[in-house]
Amino acid sequence: DQSFGWFFSNWGPAFARDGVDGWANDPAGIIVDTDGVGTVEHPYGSSSFLNAFLGGNNVLNQQYTGERYEWKPYKSVENFFRSGSVSNTSVNIRGASDDGNLSYTVNYGNLDEEGFTPGNGLRRNNLSVGGRAVLSNKFTVQGSMNYSNTSFVSPPVAASRGNGTLGWSTFGNVFFTPRNVDLMGLPFTIPENGGSIYYRNGNDIINPNWSVANAQGGQTVNRVNATTSLTYDFNDNISLTYRYGLDWYNERNKDYSNKNGVNFNDAIFGYLRTWDNNVNIHNHYVSLNGSYDLSDDVGLAFNVGATSNRRTYERSGVSSTGQIVYGVIQHFNYENQTPLAFESAQNTLGVFGSADIDYKDYLFVTLQARNDWVSNLPSENNSMFYPSASVSFLPTSMDENFKSENLSYLKVRAGYGTSASFPGGYPTVNTVGQSTNVNGGLNGGIITNSVSNFQANPDLKPELLGELEFGVDARVWKNRIGINASYYERNTKDLIVFKPLPTSSGYTS
């Protein structure tokens, strides 16, 4: 269809004057010759277009009524995006005592990144310190701490077909813009109300420049990872280690849009969502470690110990809709507020042991076992024992006659290992959602409860993952070629999956 209209997206007459598809042959006759240049009515010059939004007496109507608009390709995409930049700075300080018993390190890093999309940027500051001290009383102390602060902002981004039917996407609206529309030369704001305005007759696509100026998603993350350990050496063969680890994570989120946009309720009425996600992980670890030569041919290394892990997650925030005064991004400036809240916790206790046995440096056997208990499963199903074993044999280390110029190294290995996977949250109990309406009228507030569409499984068990592997490693042709071949089979018992359910059951999964 070569007929022009401000309803179109990516078609229309050619930009050349002549030819079958030239604008001089526009079937509708809308493109006219103005002093040798093809022109059309300015997209904001139609009184019917502007009257639909503001009534006849408005600034844009007065400015563009009767104005002509040159029919030519504009560099809208090229001019919308900008050149990105990245600045990265790092400083490292380290030192140690003359005897090596005391050492430390300090690192600082800064990243400042400006994206190629307007309104997009990332900044990160990172500080880490660490140290180690070997004391005269057989104790060794070491620790490390890393703190990072990351801030990120971006205009709306989502899956889109350009006209916004799938989601509010700045990219989609930019690439959907026809070549003959001067994106960067057209006003994007209606002066009377700050709303979005764009070229289409129905003003049914958000102007990308309005999105950049009026809507944003942002996130600031503060995170601390810290580890400290204390080791006591009873003698040269056996030691005891305690280690504590902390992972603290705080995520502050803010999404908003001013009102008077188009196409989406969030843009039309305005919204503000702010919420925090907080994660705390505390981990305690203690182990007894040993290493002995049982004979001239047999060596043994072992460790036994226990772990304790506690993980908590908390979300809290407010979602507000219905902006009252344009430009004021505060929760008190919205008609409706909905609280956001969620909490979960999981404790995991474990005991473990392992032994490594070697015979004449050519036969190696490893045995491992662990048992874990978790707090968010019923007592009859909250424990899992999972052992592992592996063996490796090096013929080339056992007998030099196996070696040659064409085979310098050969290792044959086999192993069977198991591990456990525990579900998070509270999958064995049904949950109830609670919503409040503080504006309940004369009868006061209304509290509504709803049952989750997820059906809990009180008989849920942890997953047991098992893997059997056989392999060969070799180096041939004077060590020029390395060969690694493996066969493995992996199985999962009591696999946890989300199963769709018919809605007639009252649940969906």
What residue ranges belong to the model's regions?
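Low-complexity intrinsically disordered tracts that form flexible linkers/tails across taxa
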Residues: 152-178
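Glycine-rich cofactor/substrate-binding loops
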Residues: 180, 187-189, 367
